[in-house]
Amino acid sequence: MFVLEQEDQELYDRIQEQNLNRQYELLTNCIEIGLKKGSVAFDKYMLWALNHVAVANISQFGGRFRVEPIYVGDHKPPHFKDVADWMDRYISTIQENWYIWSPTELAAYGLWRLNWIHPFIEGNGRTARATCYYLLCVRSGALLPGRKIVPERIREDRVGYENGLKAADQAWEDGHLDITKMEDYLAALLQAQLEDDGLPYQGG
């Protein structure tokens, strides 16, 4: 069962917003587990679950890696036959650098690289933003306070987000890893979240 955006925009938008709320509830559970288990809790099964809930009833291929080509503007993600290998590398890189990189470095890498691989048919951005926040919280050792969390702030500041992705893409194209621009962008959003008065985020 699924709804096409072209068939009923209002229903599609409502389902998508409800999915984001459900994804946040799942994400908080994942963060709690991550705080107990550390780097080993970060695995493909968590990513599958976060993607599945993000696209429930708007895509029939949620929660599984793509097995077909996908195109994103000027970016051409890896061939679908290579997705599983790239995702193994992605997860290993995060686990191996868990105590080396800062929370914002881990989150910047997690956000950029998942978008670069684009492992899912739908919901890659939503899954990447949730992953980014998971890494920020777990690596920082707490479910971070603030009534407007980083993923929501990213949605509101697309220019900085896209500039960070493009800068990291270009660096990788040139033969090196440089996520500095994305890290600076996330650090500013995180600071704004932590300084935001009010109750902790409740979804929405």
Q: Where is each model-derived feature located?
A:
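FIC/Doc superfamily catalytic core
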Residues: 1-204
